[in-house]
Amino acid sequence: MITMHIGFDDTDSPKMGCTTYVAALLVVKLHQIGASFTDYPNLIRLNPNVPWKTRGNGALCLRIRCNEELVEEIMETTIDTVEKNADLSYAGTDPGIVFFFNNIPDELRTFAKRTIQGIVKMKEALKLVKMFGAEAVGFKNGRGIIGGLAAIGETLEKDHTYEVITYRTPKNRGTPRRIQASSIREMNEKTLPLTFNNVDPETDRILITPRGPDPILYGIRGENPKAVKQAHEIVHSQEPIERWVIFRTNHGTDAHLRRINSISEIQPFNPVVVQGDLAKEPEVIPGGHVIFTIKDENGKVDCAAYEPTGTLRKVAKKLIAGDLIEAYGGVRQASSKHPVTINLEKIRILKLAPKISFFNPKCPHCSKRMKSMGKEKGFRCDKCGFRSSKLKKVAVKNKRVLKKGLYITSQRSQRHLTKPILRYGREKANAPKKMIVNWHFP
């Protein structure tokens, strides 16, 4: 028996397809050939800020054991399944497959981390493929080889979550999804906090169903396989489910965010965590988006809390100059219309600056609030006529509404990788030792 890791990526397009669906098909096909799975299919979300991603930027890895004589058939089946289900007609879809037969080396783990947190080049992936005797297959420019190799290298031995994904029958794809909304809300109430991001609490919007033409009916995310399977069993679908699979994933783990020491280290397209003081008061621009600038001793950068971020936007609006914060988010490159900007996913307030208001002094004779006679000309009292050029405005410290702590964008606008509040304190430190029995259908 040999161990085999099969990584693949970039099969979908905005019009159709889903790389997880290719994985779901292969789960059944590889079982039929005689392979046994050593892990749930791994769904690895890569850097969400790369400009060439299709939709969710998710790569897949299937980890199996099989007899050596089955390897060729498994490889042929994988290549055929990817080719038949990828949208090769779309200009931005460039599928890639990697077959890896060794234990996962540190070099590959490092490559995976860099692919999740930054930008890597094809030549780096191909160098590793050659170095470790892997085999790679690319369609068109084969960019999916990068994601496929990264999915193999990310073994999810630290924090991870699970997602059960259900798929529609071919005849229903492209039509409105038919699921009983009340059953989703019931599922949410019964399974929280072991599942997360099912229903947006601010708007009551259902979050488990995608809106595009892809084959997914719904996906439920949670802390363990039993929780997501139980949640799936509560949901009442009003259309047939073709198949479903439980994936192990880096969803909701903040795996993409990399802490940097200085604003000067910021690079376009990289997700970062960086500390800085507010340089000036936040500005609300057309559309309701809130923009503010943070600075440190080495530079400054704009931060944007867009209108859909909900709670985060409201928090950003209440910040003042001098507040010390950590900004979490992806870096948008500069353009002719705006500078380099961090698109915010989270804000951690570390220190609140005092908010000071200045008032005219009260008259020392009659206690009425005095009026200014002009810049540096002193004050006069309209009631008793007293005047003074020596009195100064009185500083009053106002109570801040904001509190120190972590603030996260509303659930409806959280990215796949963003760790929600519910998950703090639930981080995992090890991969699972065994799998549940029925983790896919058929």
Where are these regions (language model features)?
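Long, charge-rich boundary regions
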Residues: K392-P442
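OB-fold/S1-family single-stranded nucleic acid-binding modules
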Residues: R332-N360
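Short nucleic-acid-contacting surface segments enriched for D/E, G, S/T with interspersed K/R
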Residues: G310-E326
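OB-fold nucleic-acid-binding modules
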Residues: E233-K280, P286, V315, R348-K355
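OB-fold (S1/OB) nucleic-acid-binding surfaces
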Residues: E283-T309
